[in-house]
UniProtKB/Swiss-Prot annotation:
It is a peripheral membrane protein. It comes from the Bacteria. This is ATP synthase gamma chain. It is found in: Cell inner membrane. F-type ATPases have 2 components, CF(1) - the catalytic core - and CF(0) - the membrane proton channel. CF(1) has five subunits: alpha(3), beta(3), gamma(1), delta(1), epsilon(1). CF(0) has three main subunits: a, b and c. Coiled coil: none annotated. GO terms for cellular component: plasma membrane; proton-transporting ATP synthase complex. One of its GO terms (molecular function) is ATP binding. It comes from Polynucleobacter asymbioticus (strain DSM 18221 / CIP 109841 / QLW-P1DMWA-1) (Polynucleobacter necessarius subsp. asymbioticus). Belongs to the ATPase gamma chain family. Produces ATP from ADP in the presence of a proton gradient across the membrane. The gamma chain is believed to be important in regulating ATPase activity and the flow of protons through the CF(0) complex. One of its GO terms (biological process) is proton motive force-driven plasma membrane ATP synthesis. The gene is atpG. Pfam families: ATP-synt. Keywords: ATP synthesis, Cell inner membrane, Cell membrane, CF(1), Hydrogen ion transport, Ion transport, Membrane, Transport.
Length: 289
């Protein structure tokens, strides 16, 4: 049985660990609220671009932009969004499982995959898997900026424009609520015209005055729309990261509290046994006298 001194040392160690996890839980909760706000602020921009692109496409059906051109799929690109840091439960594992399943399904069809990694954890996974990378960006911080992401994103978009890849997918964790995040694998390119039109506005039809012309504006907006979708995915993944970390740290704090309780009980039993032994020795000594 451990001595009372050893048990006190263990209790002190677990208490210090609990202070750390409790502080990390509070920091993650604060960061999660800010990440949720950024996520909500990014949505109206993407929605408005989608609405304008849908109206332009309906008003000018003769245009067939490169981003909406479907072709036989022989090679695909996947943009993988993960976190830069750990301690967020199974968040990264869940989205990486999607990637593993995608690789298996596409390899069965002899389709090649090239990747863009956003986040250190995804980059490490792809390097271990010896996957083909065409671009990457890591250490994007708690506040994502498009100027940091754009270089990696453009590599995939330009590869699609040149016909080097035939489809682009986006893998990330969608934020549902503080307790739930779900991994998703979405098809980004080619864009489906029907997917651009919100159901509540499917019957509306608008047209605009174009300068210089409708085709160049449509091409430019489609590119901005795809970039906005990727930025939205990054903000959702960040909100998911902070909420998962908050939950993980809360679980760690609760477990530490339980361990402290068990150690305290063991300490009391050990101390009581020592006192009982001393009393027995005293009583035995007195009887001998």
């Amino acid at each position: 049985m451990a001595s009372t001194k050893e048990i006190r040392s263990k209790i002190k160690s677990v208490q210090n660990t609990r202070k750390i996890t409790k502080a990390m839980e509070m920091v993650a909760a604060s960061k999660m609220r800010r990440a949720q706000e950024r996520m909500r602020n990014a949505r109206p921009y993407a929605e408005k671009i989608r609405e304008i692109v849908a109206n332009l496409s309906k008003a000018n059906p003769e245009f067939r932009p490169a981003y909406m051109e479907a072709r036989e799929v022989k090679k695909v690109g996947t943009i993988l969004v993960t976190t830069d840091k750990g301690l967020c439960g199974g968040l990264n594992t869940n989205v990486l499982r999607f990637i593993t399943n995608q690789v298996r399904d596409l390899q069965e069809k002899n389709i090649e995959i090239v990747y863009t990694a956003i986040g250190s954890k995804g980059l490490q996974f792809l390097n271990r898997s010896k996957a083909k990378l065409i671009s990457q960006t890591i250490q994007i911080g708690d506040t994502p900026h498009m100027d940091v992401l754009i270089g990696a994103i453009i590599a995939q978009l330009e590869a699609f424009e040149r016909g080097e890849i035939d489809a682009v997918y986006l893998a990330y964790n969608r934020f549902v609520n503080a307790m739930k995040q779900e991994p998703v694998l979405e098809k980004l390119l080619p864009l489906e015209p029907a997917a651009l039109v919100p159901e509540d506005k499917a019957g509306n039809s608008w047209d605009y005055i174009y300068e210089p012309d409708a085709e160049s504006i449509l091409n430019g907006l489609l590119k901005r729309y795809v970039e906005a979708m990727i930025y939205q995915a990054v903000t959702e993944n960040m909100a998911s990261e902070q909420s998962a970390r908050m939950v993980s740290m809360k679980a760690a704090s609760d477990n530490a509290k339980n361990v402290i309780g068990e150690l305290q009980l063991e300490y009391n039993k050990t101390r009581q046994a020592a006192i009982t032994k001393e009393l027995s020795e005293i009583v035995g000594g007195a009887a001998a006298v």
